[in-house]
């Protein structure tokens, strides 16, 4: 199978219910009911507006260097992504390549199966019980990883 064929088989993400009512805060899409903290507001006001027109350093080197110094590691040991989906994508490519299925609950972050399908990583979902609890016995099987 060609890579392109594999991508075409990925089922597009479909957002959950998106009610359109006034004053509704949608926590499932990371909306926040609170205004920015005073320090954030002040930093935004003091920011040079020209900086907003430009992309940041593509490899986040200043941030990587600061994190490496803070944690006492080499910069090569620090990974910085451009959002949680980027970090998860890299984690799937890096850690879940044993050929064994990864396991995760059937009610979870909706992109786990998308990444698994895209990168041809076998997976198995484990049902939650009627009280939304995981059954540890479901995870006692050969696997490449368990995601909670």
State each model region's role:
Residues 94-115:
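Conserved PLP-anchoring active-site segment centered on the Schiff-base-forming lysine
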Residues 1-54, 140-142:
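N-terminal "arm"/small-domain region of PLP-dependent enzymes with the aminotransferase-like
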Residues 129-148:
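Active-site phosphate-binding strand-loop segment of PLP-dependent enzymes
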Residues 119-123:
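A short helix-loop-beta submotif of the ANL/AMP-binding
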Residues 61-101:
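Phosphate-binding glycine-rich loop
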Residues 106, 125-130:
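Short beta->alpha connector loops at strand-helix junctions that form conserved
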Residues 56, 80, 104:
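Conserved SAM-binding loop
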